[in-house]
Amino acid sequence: MGHESPLYSLDLFGHEMIFDLSSMLMLTVTAAIVFLIAMLFTRNLSVRPHGKQNFIEWIFDFTRGIINSNMAWNKGGRFHFLAVTLLLFIFVANMLGLPFAIINGHTLWWKSPTADPTVTLTLSTLMVLLTHFYGVKMRGTGNYLKSFAQPVWFMVPFKIIEEFSSTLTLGLRLYGNIFAGEVLLGLLATLGTAGAAGMLGAAIPTLIWQGFSIFVGSIQAYIFVMLSMVYMSHKVSDDH
């Protein structure tokens, strides 16, 4: 493939910070698309939903089901908008790199932002930190800290390790699936440039793989939201 990400380095108090401009661009595009979806699909709401309102209500019902399957609604209802936003954001992010890629020289500008491990690990870290925040807020600091020593005190180091492993698996699972899909699409696109025979040979596999990638991207968005709500329920529910 030989494609590189456009990087920008900044010296901050003697420490070099490196920014991936393509990931920043694609995250901005993703956020803008999700914002437009929210704006367009929630205009002129009616008691009897029709058209685009059916879609957005289905998203809300779907995420409500995810939350209800993990915790009581009186605790989980406050996370409803979080789940909806997370599902839409990750789904859109997973889809952006499928139709095409924008490459300037050897620099890749247009891709799925979730094909970058920094992005997915940042998302998973934010979600795990959010579970700790709500665990303390809803259960109290003392009760929350005690939960790490249950059922026996020597479980504490194992539960700390579990927090790190949950963060890694949540982020790397999403990254691995999306990155692998884009790599194969890139290889098929390269094959398509090898004359008429290569184009014909790559056309059908590319269409099939793009369809499969849409399915995988949708499933991965669902899994990320589901696991986030599972982790949240473990932190805010007294019976966990």
UniProtKB/Swiss-Prot annotation:
Membrane-spanning parts: 21-41, 83-103, 116-136, 184-204, 207-227
Keyword Transport recorded: yes
Topology in the lipid bilayer: Multi-pass membrane protein
Keywords, sorted A to Z: ATP synthesis, Cell membrane, CF(0), Hydrogen ion transport, Ion transport, Membrane, Transmembrane, Transmembrane helix, Transport
GO biological process: proton motive force-driven plasma membrane ATP synthesis
Complexes and interactors: F-type ATPases have 2 components, CF(1) - the catalytic core - and CF(0) - the membrane proton channel. CF(1) has five subunits: alpha(3), beta(3), gamma(1), delta(1), epsilon(1). CF(0) has three main subunits: a(1), b(2) and c(9-12). The alpha and beta chains form an alternating ring which encloses part of the gamma chain. CF(1) is attached to CF(0) by a central stalk formed by the gamma and epsilon chains, while a peripheral stalk is formed by the delta and b chains.
Listed name of the protein: ATP synthase subunit a
Source organism (scientific name): Macrococcus caseolyticus (strain JCSC5402) (Macrococcoides caseolyticum)
Gene giving rise to this polypeptide: atpB
